[in-house]
């Protein structure tokens, strides 16, 4: 697997290491002790292609750099493709061995089928468990382990082994839900968040700094929606009992580094800083990309 790591253009001065030179020195220093890591400089001098042995390998490096004071943006993980002698695209294939409680067998088979997995074998295991064996592209497993643990309520076990390279099996839709995107720069307020929380799950609370193009939550539907979470209520001379009621917000979902890396889509980046994790669109300007612009009352 590989991820693109690049300098964050919206730099935070309080962090110690924010330039592309700092990132380059740190990544190439890691090569001295990690023989399974590969670092490639991209044509864009701000970006580096970092390849490793899997999601965990790369996430450990990201967390270590974060704790050391580095600030950077990370793309969604991608697999390394090959081509055969005829120029046909090949992708890595793995065998997934899964032990799952009987009542969760259906949802696991459904989810892996959506990720181009092929069920090879199915049998009965001990203690009310079912043993499943899937052949699945490596990219189909990207971001799935956290979803698997949620679907099986922490009772499932999954192990994988590399099989080889096979012809490309088609596109995979990693997420069914779209993103909630801020289109105003400022500070989130309760009034704006109260209107936005009806559209899906929020990742931020009131009093947090946001900017245009920042992902502030997950939409309940498939498309991306732009919202203004910085808007305040217009004051009037008319008061009513309903207007004076306190607005109650659902507690936001705070993503860990692993959850954020799993969540981001191919058109998004994860901003990693020592103190915060922020998800953003690669193209911040909504005028150059098609989003649903929604103005809530």
Provide a role label for each language-model segment.
Residues 136, 147-266, 271-294:
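Long insertion/accessory domains within large nucleic-acid-processing enzymes
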Residues 34-42, 120-122, 155-160, 271-273:
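Flexible, glycine/charged-enriched surface loops at secondary-structure junctions
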Residues 10, 14-16, 90-100:
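Short glycine-/aliphatic-rich beta-strand segments at the starts of folded cytosolic domains
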Residues 1-9, 13, 293-296:
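Single conserved hydrophobic/aromatic residue that forms the stacking wall/gate
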Residues 31-35, 65-72, 113-120, 149-157:
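A common structural junction motif
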Residues 7-10, 14-45, 67:
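Catalytic P-loop NTP-binding/switch module of NTPases
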Residues 38-84, 93-94, 101-107, 131, ...:
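Conserved structured catalytic cores and adjacent interaction surfaces
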């Amino acid at each position: 697997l590989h991820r693109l790591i690049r300098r964050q253009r919206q730099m935070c001065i309080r962090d110690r290491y924010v330039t592309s030179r700092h990132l380059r020195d740190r990544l190439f220093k890691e090569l001295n002790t990690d023989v399974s890591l590969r670092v490639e400089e991209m044509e864009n001098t701000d970006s580096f292609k970092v390849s490793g042995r899997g999601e965990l390998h790369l996430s450990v490096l990201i967390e270590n750099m974060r704790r050391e004071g580095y600030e950077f943006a990370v793309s969604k993980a991608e697999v390394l493709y090959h081509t055969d002698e005829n120029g046909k695209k090949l992708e890595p294939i793995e065998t997934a061995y899964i032990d799952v409680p009987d009542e969760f067998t259906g949802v696991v088979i459904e989810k892996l089928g959506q990720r181009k997995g092929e069920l090879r074998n199915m049998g009965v295991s001990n203690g009310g468990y079912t043993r499943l064996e899937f052949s699945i592209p490596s990219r189909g497993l990207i971001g799935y382990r956290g979803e698997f643990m949620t679907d099986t309520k922490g009772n499932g076990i999954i192990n994988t082994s590399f099989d080889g390279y096979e012809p490309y099996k088609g596109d995979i839709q990693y997420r069914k839900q779209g993103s909630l995107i801020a289109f105003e720069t400022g500070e989130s307020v309760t009034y704006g968040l109260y209107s936005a929380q009806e559209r899906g799950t929020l990742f931020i609370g009131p009093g947090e700094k946001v900017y245009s193009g920042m992902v502030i939550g997950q939409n309940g539907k498939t498309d991306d929606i732009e919202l203004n979470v910085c808007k305040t209520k217009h004051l009037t001379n008319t008061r009513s009992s309903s207007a004076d009621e306190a607005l109650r917000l659902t507690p936001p979902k705070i993503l860990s580094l692993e959850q954020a890396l799993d969540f981001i889509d191919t058109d998004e980046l994860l901003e990693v800083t020592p103190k915060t994790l922020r998800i953003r669109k690669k193209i911040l300007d909504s005028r150059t990309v098609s989003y649903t612009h929604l103005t809530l009352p």
